[in-house]
A protein has these predicted regions:
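Sequence/structural signature of beta-propeller domains
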Residues: 1-145, 151, 157-160
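Sequence context surrounding c-type heme c attachment/ligation sites in exported
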Residues: 36-37, 54, 68-72, 80, ...
């Protein structure tokens, strides 16, 4: 680490490192994550050893080298080499390999209008399976993989294929492949590259960006939880031995833009797009719990915002009957210091309208 710049994220606990000598080509790399976050500063001792200062925990912790993994685990340079996607080399729509299980969440995450194909594998067919924790999040065994391919809705051209992986040593990491313009192949990216589709344009996330949202508190694998799958699909996966029984999970989300009750649809949309960070133990600011089952009080109903009121008089996180005074909705409308903070350049007009309609329908802060 000598000669390299190290910095940390107070909220997530992610520590990054980059080479300042690389100039504008410098790409931050995720060094490690301090459980619980709370990284306030760094210090060196007389031997040059590095320490992390944690404010709320009142702790000084030493950075020590991690043991080298027993087996190197690099990702292939080309998507076709992963074995997870069928790439015919002629520009046909890529499809997940037969060994992967396809799925569609009930309440999809907003990604600037891009369409997505999703699949996963426990990583050791016939032996390993996904477990389910008390929150209903599926927990992957070592070598488990989730994959998502983004397509441009205007011409169905593949733009990007992302992987989120639990490695053999138990660590998690995200990787992404950028599709070539001819759609014949995709190449491993470092992050920061521009995606220029016909109707969708955005910037590829870095591996550090992936870990900002894919946190332990939300089970790491966002979107893969019992509540995001219909009961028949859950039962089918359980019967096949792919996932453990989620019989204790009673929560199921609803399609945000379907015909269910307004409150349920808004709760599902917020759960999908916001609760990865805004939940107990998550990195979201404001001490909010935006999981679908959380109470209105936990979601910030009639609570003054802890960070910024955005210049709004008498602002609340959720102001019953007044979306124009509700910071929750106002953050969704912004393109800077916004919610969600990563993974999107444009706002979700339909999602904003849904949440504002729900807030407008509230007469008081009782579920």
């Amino acid at each position: 680490l000598r000669g390299r710049y190290i910095y940390g994220d107070y909220v997530t606990g992610n520590l990054f490192v980059f080479d300042p000598g690389a100039g504008t080509a410098a790409t931050p790399e995720l060094l490690t994550t301090v459980p619980g976050g709370d990284v306030a500063g760094f210090a060196e001792d007389r031997d040059g050893e590095l320490y992390v200062l944690r404010l709320a925990a009142s702790r000084i912790e030493k950075l020590t080298p991690a043991p080298a993994p027993a087996i190197a685990d690099p990702f292939p340079a080309r998507l076709s080499e992963t074995g997870c996607v069928v790439v015919d080399g002629r520009g046909a729509t890529p499809t997940p390999a037969p060994a992967l299980v396809r799925y569609t969440p009930i309440a999809p995450f907003w990604s600037d209008g891009a369409e997505k194909d999703r699949a996963f594998t426990p990583g050791n067919a016939g032996v390993a399976r996904l477990s389910v924790d008390g929150d209903g999040d599926y927990r992957f065994p070592a070598l488990g993989v989730a994959m998502k391919t983004f397509r441009d809705p205007a011409d169905q051209r593949p733009l990007e294929t992302r992987f989120f992986v639990r490695h053999a040593d138990g660590t998690h990491a995200g990787y992404t492949y950028l599709w070539r313009p001819d759609g014949h192949e995709a190449d491993l990216a470092r992050g920061g590259e521009a995606v220029l589709g016909t109707s969708v344009q955005y910037t590829l996330p870095s591996r550090g960006d992936c870990m900002t949202c894919h946190q332990e508190a939300a089970g790491y694998f966002l979107g893969l939880e019992a509540a995001q799958l219909t009961a028949p699909i859950r039962k089918s996966l359980e019967d096949q031995g792919i996932v453990a029984s989620a019989s204790t999970v009673t929560r199921t989300l609803v399609p945000p833009f379907g015909s269910d009750e307004l409150a349920l649809r808004a709760a599902s949309d917020l759960h999908s797009n916001c609760s990865g960070c805004h939940r107990p133990g998550g990195s979201g600011r404001g001490d909010l719990d935006l999981r679908a089952e959380a109470t209105l009080a936990a979601k910030g109903c009639d609570r003054r915002p802890e960070t910024s009121d955005l210049g709004v008089a008498d602002a609340r996180v959720i102001a019953p009957g007044a979306p124009e005074r509700s910071v929750l909705a106002l953050r969704m409308r912004r393109t800077e210091v916004r919610m969600p903070p990563l993974g999107s350049r444009t706002t979700d007009a339909a999602g904003i309208a849904l949440v504002e309609s729900w807030i407008g329908s509230l007469a008081r802060c009782s579920n």
